[in-house]
Amino acid sequence: MTKEYKTIVEVSGPLIFLEKTEPVGYGELVQINLPDGTTKRGQVLDTSADMVVVQVFEGTVGLNEESGVVFSGETIKLPVSKDMLGRILSGAGEPLDGGPRIIPDKRVDINGASMNPYSRMPPEDFIQTGISTIDGTNTLVRGQKLPIFSGSGLPHNEIALQIARQAKVPGSDEPFAVVFAAMGITNEEAQYFMDDFEKTGALERAVVFLNLADDPAVERIVTPRMALTAAEYLAYEHDMHVLVILTDITNYCEALRQMGAAREEVPGRRGYPGYMYTDLASLYERAGVIKGIKGSVTQFSILTMPGDDITHPIPDLSGYITEGQIVVSRELHRKGIYPPINVLPSLSRLMNSGIGEGKTRDDHKAVSDQMYAAYAEGRDLRGLVAIVGKEALSERDRKMLEFADLFEDRFVRQSRDEDRTIDDTLRIAWEILAELPEAQLTRIDNKYLDKYHPAHQKSE
C-alpha cells in the first residue's frame, strides 16, 4: 500500500520542501496529488536529516499544504526500444509526432552507469560530417566529445542539422544513428527541426528529443540525459555507432542556475552553481568507445556563448572536459560565409588518431598543417594591409593574403546541403594550396607534393 504524505512546509519556484518522515532515495520519482484531484510529477532533488526537496516537473501552481506526496521508490527511467528510431519525442520522452507510445524492450535509468576508465578504448575512427572545416582541419573521431562554440544569431542550428543529415563512418557498413536533443527552443525552432528531419529523410535513422522554452526548467535538465540514455542503448545493446547532438547547452546551464537559485544555494561564478563543472562532466563523459563492444557514442554539444565571450563559465568549463572545440565566427557570418567556422581557434585534440593512411588519406595531416599556417599568416597580413596598404607588401605576402581569401571562399564556404567526402575536401585544399609557390609549402613533404599537387598531376 502506498503512503501519502501531507507534510509540505514551503513552495519555492519549481521546488517544494517537505518534512521528512521516513528514508527517501535521491532522484526518486514523486507523485503530487492536488486538492482539486489533479496530479503532478516530481523528483527528489535533495534529502537531509529532517527535510526533503522535490522538484516539480509541471510547475508548482496550485500546490499548498493540503497537497499529498507519494514516493514511488523508483528513479526516472526511459522506455527504450529500437523502435525509437524515426520518432520525435518531448524532453520527457513523450511522443510529439502523433505516433503511439513506444513499447519498450526495457526501462533504463537516465543517469546511466559510469564508464570504467580501464574499459575505455582510445577513439581512432574517422567520422565524416561532410563539412570541410570539420573533416579537413578539426576532424571528428568516433567516441569523441567535441563542442561547437557559437553565439546568438549565428547558424549553429543549421550546422547541427547538416551534421545530423550527413554524418557517417565512410567505408563501413556498420549501422549508424543520430540522437538529436534540443533544449529550451522556441516553437518556431521546434517546427523547423521537425520539418527538416522529415523532409530530408534523416529521421529514419534518428531519435529526436525536443524540450521547448515554455516547458519546465526541470525537464530541461532531464532532456540530455534522456538522449544519452537512448544513445547508450542503441550503441551498447544494438552495436550501432551513435552521434549525439545536444543543443543548446547554455539553456541547460541556465536551468541549473534557476534550480540552484530556487534551492537558495550559494552561487559560484556569475551566479551558476558551484557544481556545474561536475554536472556538465556527467553529460560529456558519457561519450566513448568500450572494449569488447562494437557500438560507440560520439557527442557534438552546441553552446551559445553569452556576449560571444569564450571565457564565460559555460564554454570555459566545457573546454576543460571536452576534447577540443569548433568555434563559429560572427566575422565570417557577416561576410555571408556558411558554415562560418573559424578554424584558427578551433581544435580537435583527437584528430591525429583518426586521420592518415587507412583512415582518411596519407597526406591529410600535412595538408591540414599547411593550410592552418598559411591562413594564419594571411589573416595577420590583413591587419597589416589596413595600416600600410597592399602596395607595401612583398610578392610572397600578397600570395598569402590571396590564400586567406581563397581559403574562406572555397574551402570554408559550402552550401547547406553540400555533402563533401574527405576526398572532395582534400582536393579543394590542394587546389587552393597550388596557388602558393611550392617553396612556401614548407609543411608538406615532397612525396605528397609529387603525389597530390595539381601541377605535378598535370605534368604526368
From Swiss-Prot:
GO annotation terms (biological process):
proton motive force-driven plasma membrane ATP synthesis
Instruction: Please give the GO cellular component terms listed in this UniProt entry.
Output: plasma membrane; proton-transporting two-sector ATPase complex, catalytic domain
Q: Name one GO molecular function term.
A: proton-transporting ATP synthase activity, rotational mechanism
- Cellular compartments annotated: Cell membrane
Recorded topology in the membrane: Peripheral membrane protein
Enumerate the UniProt keywords alphabetically. Answer: ATP synthesis, Cell membrane, Hydrogen ion transport, Ion transport, Membrane, Transport
Pfam families, per database record: ATP-synt_ab (PF00006), ATP-synt_ab_N (PF02874), ATP-synt_VA_C (PF22919)
Could you tell me the superkingdom of the organism this chain comes from?
Archaea
Q: What is its main location?
A: membrane
Q: Which residues form a coiled coil?
A: none
Q: Which HAMAP family match?
A: ATP_synth_B_arch (MF_00310)
Q: How does it assemble?
A: Has multiple subunits with at least A(3), B(3), C, D, E, F, H, I and proteolipid K(x).
What's its job? Component of the A-type ATP synthase that produces ATP from ADP in the presence of a proton gradient across the membrane. The B chain is a regulatory subunit.
> What is the similarity comment for this entry?
Belongs to the ATPase alpha/beta chains family.
Q: What is this protein called?
A: A-type ATP synthase subunit B
Tell me which species this is from. Answer: Methanococcoides burtonii (strain DSM 6242 / NBRC 107633 / OCM 468 / ACE-M)
